[in-house]
C-alpha cells in the first residue's frame, strides 16, 4: 500500500535535516495517514480508506463519504474509490427507479 492519501493525493516529500552547524542530511516527510472507516448511508456499510487528516476533513466538509464520492468526478478518484462510487450510483439509480 502506497503512502498516499486517497482523497487529497498527499504523499511522501523529501528534504533536509539541517544541524546547528548547518550540515545537511536527507530526510523524508511522511504524510499523516490514518486508516478510517466511514459509514456510507447508501451502501449501509463502512468504507475503509487510507486518508490524511486533511483528507478526512475534506470528506466531512463535503457532507460525508456519499456526498463526496457522488460529487467528485471519477477521474479524480483512486481505483478503489471508483468501484465504491459505481456501487453507490447503481443503488441510488435502483432506488430512484423503484420510487
Swiss-Prot record:
Record-linked Pfam families: Ribosomal_L28 (PF00830)
GO molecular function: structural constituent of ribosome
Gene Ontology biological process terms in this record: translation
SUPFAM superfamilies: L28p-like (SSF143800)
GO cellular component terms, A-Z: ribonucleoprotein complex; ribosome
Taxonomic superkingdom: Bacteria
Record's keyword terms, sorted: Ribonucleoprotein, Ribosomal protein
InterPro entries, A to Z: Ribosomal_bL28, Ribosomal_bL28/bL31-like_sf, Ribosomal_bL28_bact-type, Ribosomal_bL28_sf
Family statement drawn from the similarity comment of this UniProt entry: Belongs to the bacterial ribosomal protein bL28 family.
Stated name of the protein: Large ribosomal subunit protein bL28
Amino acid at each position: 500500500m502506497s503512502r498516499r492519501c486517497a482523497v487529497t493525493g498527499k504523499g511522501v516529500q523529501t528534504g533536509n535535516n539541517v544541524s546547528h552547524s548547518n550540515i545537511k542530511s536527507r530526510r523524508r516527510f511522511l504524510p499523516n495517514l490514518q486508516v478510517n472507516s466511514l459509514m456510507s448511508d447508501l451502501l449501509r456499510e463502512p468504507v475503509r480508506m487510507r486518508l490524511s487528516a486533511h483528507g478526512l476533513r475534506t470528506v466531512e466538509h463535503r457532507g460525508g463519504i456519499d456526498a463526496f464520492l457522488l460529487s467528485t468526478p471519477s477521474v479524480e478518484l483512486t481505483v478503489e474509490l471508483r468501484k465504491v462510487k459505481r456501487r453507490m450510483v447503481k443503488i441510488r439509480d435502483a432506488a430512484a427507479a423503484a420510487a
